[in-house]
Every structure is written in structure tokens, then in C-alpha cells.
Amino acid sequence: MKRRQKRKHLENEESQETAEKGGGIQRIHRDSPQPQSPLAQVQERGETPPRSQHVSLSFHSSYKTCVSSLCVNKEERGMKIYYMQVQMNKGVAVSWETEETLESLEKQPRMEEVTLSEVVRVGTPPSDVSTRNLLSDSEPSGEEKEHEERTESDSLPGSPTVEDTPRAKTPDWLVTMENGFRCMACCRVFTTMEALQEHVQFGIREGFSCHVFHLTMAQLTGNMESESTQDEQEEENGNEKEEEEKPEAKEEEGQPTEEDLGLRRSWSQCPGCVFHSPKDRNS
């Protein structure tokens, strides 16, 4: 019993000592001054904290990337228009440079091109407006058609109203002309180059467009030109290699081969072919 009481007494004393030590450490930490952050020190002084350089740099770099992405989406390039200079003979378009006017164009076709400067967005179609919408807007509605039919049925063929009505103006492409520029897509002949360019650029207003034809034609001609340049480079490289191989072959021909050396040695070592000196002959 006494031993148990002593053990309990010792354990109680040890627990009290540890509790006192822990309280002293906490008091020391509370009493010691804590280091203040630079922002807190600046706020106590009443000064405005300076902006960090890292934030400004990151914002500047993000602005640059946005601007570059916008610039990449636009590309300035020229569009090529393919045409042929023709002259009219009895309503038939014949070649500009043919001596005989009755000669057909298929025998001596000569296609020319002109660049039309414009800004084209990369990855976008040539025209955002569909052809169907344009045709539906230009075509008259059902009510307008009925009204026109009624007016035609009411008017008699011999009435003065029909005689006084002006005739419709013939389109420019039906007017006979001596010479002009023929579009290679739709084969229509235009009087001036400006009219041809306007037709290619804004032909969608008329219900159809030759814009896509000229774009694809330019791509095909560009591919053919690149292939021809590659073939020429390959031919030049092949000719250079042949020229380098020719002197090497000549050097090999000039040097005696091992077979020739072996034949010479065999003839010199032949017992029947012994050459005597003039002294031996005199003796």
C-alpha cells in the first residue's frame, strides 16, 4: 500500500512539473515580439504598398498573346482572276491574237491572269451569305405573282397601256460588242477589266458567283508551279551528281587494275622470254 501511494505521489509531481514547463514556454512565445510582414509595416506607416513587378509582367505577356492571336486570324493576300481577251465575230467570241477570225478558241487558248488585292480571313468561306437566301429575297412572293397575273389578264393586247409601257433594258452581257474580256468560269464577255473584277468579287448579287472557281484555279496553278520547281531542282541535283561521278570514273580508268599487273608479272617471269644484255651476246 505504501509503495502504491508513493508511485501515485511521484506521478502527480511529474505531471505538475510538465504542466508548469509547458505554460512557461507558452508565456515566452506570447511575450516575444512577432516579426511583422512588410505589408503590415507599410500600412502602420501610412504608405501605399508598391505593386509587385511579377503581376505587371504577367499581365503584359497575356496582353501580347491576345494581340498576336488576333493578328494571326487575318492575312492580306491578292486574289487572281483568270480571263481571256477575245473579239466578237457574228456573235461568237474568238481569240484576240488569231490571224483567222473563224478559228476556234480551242486550238490556241491563251489564258491570262490579274491580281485583285483584298483582305481575306483565313479559314472562312468566300461569302458568308448563302445563295439560297439571296435568291429567295430577289424572287417575288406568291401575292406579287398573283397581282402581276391579274394585271396581265386585264390588259388587252391592243390597249394603249401596253404600247406605252417601256421595254425592259437588255443586260450588259447580252449587248453585242467588238472585243472584251471573257471570264474563264462562266464564259461571259465583259467590256472592261473593272467590270470583270466586279463580277468576280460581287457576283453573288446576280445569283451565282465565280469567286470559288478563281480561288481553286489559283491553288491548282500554285501547286503545279511548286511541282515544276521541285522537278527542276531534282534535275539540277542529278546533273551535278553525274558531273561529280565522271572525273572519278576517268581516274579509275587511268589507274591499272590488279589483273593488268598480274599479266605483266607473268610475262616478265616467263622462262622463254629471257632478255640478254649486249655483253652476254658478245661473249
Curated annotation (Swiss-Prot):
Ranges where the record places region Disordered: 1-54, 123-171, 223-283
Q: Locations of Polar residues compositional bias? A: 127-138
Q: Which InterPro entries match?
A: Spt46-like
Q: Where is the composition biased (Basic and acidic residues)?
A: 142-153
Question: Which chain positions lie within coiled-coil regions?
Answer: none
**Which of the residues bear the PTM Phosphoserine?**
S268
Start-end of Acidic residues biased regions: 228-246
The zinc fingers classed as C2H2-type run over: 181-205
Residues annotated with Phosphothreonine modification: T170
Query: What GO biological process terms are annotated to this protein in UniProt?
Result: fertilization; positive regulation of DNA-templated transcription; transcription by RNA polymerase II
Keywords in alphabetical order, please: Activator, DNA-binding, Metal-binding, Nucleus, Phosphoprotein, Transcription, Transcription regulation, Zinc, Zinc-finger
Where in or outside the cell? Nucleus
Superkingdom as given in the UniProt entry: Eukaryota
Q: Which Pfam families match?
A: Spt46
Q: Name one GO cellular component term.
A: nucleus
Q: Which GO terms describe its molecular function?
A: DNA binding; zinc ion binding
In the record, the note on similarity to other proteins reads:
Belongs to the FAM170 family.
What this protein is reported to do is described as: Acts as a nuclear transcription factor that positively regulates the expression of heat shock genes. Binds to heat shock promoter elements (HSE).
Q: What's in the domain note?
A: The N-terminus is necessary for nuclear localization. The C-terminus is necessary for transcriptional activity.
Entry protein name: Protein FAM170A
What organism does the UniProt record list as the source? Macaca fascicularis
Q: Which gene encodes it?
A: FAM170A
